[in-house]
From Swiss-Prot:
Chief location category: cytoplasm
UniProt-listed Enzyme Commission number(s): 2.3.2.6
PANTHER family recorded: LEUCYL/PHENYLALANYL-TRNA--PROTEIN TRANSFERASE (PTHR30098), LEUCYL_PHENYLALANYL-TRNA--PROTEIN TRANSFERASE (PTHR30098:SF2)
Its biological purpose: Functions in the N-end rule pathway of protein degradation where it conjugates Leu, Phe and, less efficiently, Met from aminoacyl-tRNAs to the N-termini of proteins containing an N-terminal arginine or lysine.
Pfam families: Leu_Phe_trans
SUPFAM superfamilies (alphabetical): Acyl-CoA N-acyltransferases (Nat) (SSF55729)
Catalyzed reactions: N-terminal L-lysyl-[protein] + L-leucyl-tRNA(Leu) = N-terminal L-leucyl-L-lysyl-[protein] + tRNA(Leu) + H(+); N-terminal L-arginyl-[protein] + L-leucyl-tRNA(Leu) = N-terminal L-leucyl-L-arginyl-[protein] + tRNA(Leu) + H(+); L-phenylalanyl-tRNA(Phe) + an N-terminal L-alpha-aminoacyl-[protein] = an N-terminal L-phenylalanyl-L-alpha-aminoacyl-[protein] + tRNA(Phe)
NCBIfam families (UniProt xref): aat (TIGR00667)
Protein name as catalogued: Leucyl/phenylalanyl-tRNA--protein transferase
Organism: Burkholderia cenocepacia (strain ATCC BAA-245 / DSM 16553 / LMG 16656 / NCTC 13227 / J2315 / CF5610)
Length: 254
């Protein structure tokens, strides 16, 4: 049985999450609320919410866990060419936290292969916007000719970034945002981005799975560190445009 959490109930041990032989591997608990305080507690423990409209709030801690080490980010020759163009041409911008709610809404509306509807519900948008207002959630946005054309958002505590979702209205717009984030996190010495679940798109960019135990141990250490600055722009991409950065073709985004 998946535990039901009342408003004051703590999360169970992550070891109680459903295993791979079940229909919902990684499912840890369910609740009726998505209060900011519970959401913060979840991230500090390596837990995240994922559910659809009409369902209770479902809390997950999968094993293994998909991560992206910034130092292992792969840049294909075509993406490197795109990044050089972004650096060179002034009509391309990367903005941070300029339109966080708009990025979330765009991620919610983006079509996903094999998915109907969206898990980014109005309740999710409200909860993460609250984290954004407190400085614990951020959007990295690709702009072209004054229009937001792609981006991503996620949660940050200490020296840990938890990626949530991305979208692109034009080719490579989400990759430009991710590459800019990775370049900034490299500069800051961050060792890990949480990607939650394995996808071919993330794997093509250098993502890999690690054991949940190792992931949670890293989270506990990283979130206890002082927070990093969140002021940067596309100029950080210069570090990713050398021929040493290589990658395979991409697949599906979350």
């Amino acid at each position: 049985m998946v535990p039901w959490l009342g408003p004051d109930d703590p999360f169970p041990s992550i070891e109680r999450a459903l295993g791979p032989a079940t229909g919902a591997p990684g499912l840890l608990a369910a609740s009726a609320d998505l209060l900011p305080s519970r959401l913060i507690d979840a991230y500090l423990r390596g837990i995240f919410p994922w559910y659809s409209d009409g369902q209770p709030v479902l809390w997950w801690s999968p094993d293994p866990r998909m991560i992206l080490v910034p130092a292992e980010f792969k840049v294909s020759p075509s993406l490197r060419k795109t990044l050089k163009r972004v650096l060179r041409e002034p009509d391309w911008e990367v903005r941070v936290d300029h339109d966080f709610p708009g990025v979330m809404r765009a991620c919610a509306q983006a079509p996903r292969r094999g998915q109907r509807g969206t898990w980014i519900t109005a309740e999710i948008i409200d909860a993460y916007t609250s984290l954004y207002r407190s400085g614990n959630a951020h959007s990295i946005e690709t702009w072209h000719d004054g229009r937001r054309v792609g981006g991503l958002y996620g949660v940050s505590f200490g020296r840990m970034f938890f990626g949530e979702s991305m979208y692109a209205d034009v080719t490579d717009a989400s990759k430009i945002a991710l590459a800019t984030l990775v370049a900034h996190l490299r500069e800051q010495g961050l060792e890990m981005i949480d990607c939650q679940q394995n996808t071919s798109h993330l794997a093509s960019l250098g993502g890999r799975e690690i054991a949940r135990k190792a992931f949670v141990a890293h989270v506990r250490s990283a979130v206890a560190e002082p927070p990093i600055p969140w002021q940067f722009d596309k100029r950080v991409l210069a570090a990713l445009t050398s021929p040493a950065e290589t990658a395979a073709p991409s697949g599906t985004e979350r």
